[in-house]
Design a protein with these regions (language model features):
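Short, Asp-centered acidic motifs that coordinate Mg2+ and/or phosphate
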Residues: 80, 107-108, 184
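Active-site-proximal specificity loops/subdomain of glycosyltransferases
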Residues: 23-79
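Short beta-strand-to-loop acidic/aromatic patch adjacent to the donor-nucleotide binding site
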Residues: 78-90
Length: 238
């Protein structure tokens, strides 16, 4: 999914005509990852979840959300930041839409994705053909995984040691952008699960939820970390 995500962002950036968009990736210092231009890397992250939470096994190097955002904050002077999970693709008008919403007075935005099929008419969706997804309705997804916020708001956010990769990082992030903004807007918040989206802006290929399989110690620990900061993530859809 990541090649599709990357190319969709490049395509959307190239079709943006009402604002300047810089694309950044963030990686751990041990990761051997390359990104095509115009993507740039922030400084490498120096730690991950098991470096700060002793109970976690050293199997998954999941970064802390505050470290990711701090790295972006230092790398960019942009007035507004957009964070998406690494497997979330965007539509061609994505950045234009966000720019219009900001100009209309919103200072934070959450966009719920649509889950798209892995195959269409016998074709497996990949980086060469993913735009055929844009005529699909997809399926409703309740999770929060795309956020827009002002750079000054980040300085007020409290994440503790919550890390990415498993819930409830999305609920915690949503809680924080709502608390630190003056005019919040939520796209695709509600609706008939079988009906069309309010606006198709982001997508995910498939609906796999690997973090649900077996007993997930990372999910359990992330819940504990969120509760330490009194995040009401359990009620974040209300």
């Amino acid at each position: 999914a990541q090649p599709v995500t990357i190319q969709s962002m490049i395509n959307a950036r190239n079709k943006t005509d009402n604002c300047k968009v810089d694309l950044f990736g963030v990686k751990n210092k041990f990761d051997k990852v390359k990104l095509p231009s115009p993507f740039k890397f922030t400084n490498d992250l120096e730690r991950c979840c098991y470096d700060v939470i002793d109970s976690l096994p050293k199997k998954k190097s999941l970064p802390l959300i505050k470290d990711i955002l701090s790295s972006l904050y230092r790398a960019s002077s942009a007035e507004y930041f957009i964070y998406t999970n690494s497997d979330i693709g965007v539509l061609p008008d994505f950045y234009n839409f966000i720019s219009e919403k900001i100009k209309s007075g919103f200072d934070s935005i959450c966009i719920n994705r649509r889950d798209m099929p892995k195959h269409i008419s016998g074709q497996e969706i990949d980086v060469s053909n993913f735009e055929i997804l844009f005529s699909e309705l997809g399926k409703y997804h309740m999770g929060a995984d795309c956020f827009v916020f002002h750079r000054d708001a980040f300085k007020k956010m409290i994440f503790g040691n919550v890390f990415v990769g498993v819930p409830p990082v999305g609920g915690v992030f949503l809680d924080q952008i709502r608390k630190t903004s003056n005019n919040f807007h939520w796209v695709n918040r509600k609706g008939d699960k079988q009906g069309p989206p309010e606006r198709l802006l982001t997508f995910h290929i498939g609906s796999d939820r690997n973090w649900l399989k077996n007993e997930n110690i990372y999910w359990t620990e992330n819940n504990k970390q969120a509760k330490k900061n009194n995040h009401p993530f359990e009620n974040h859809l209300k």
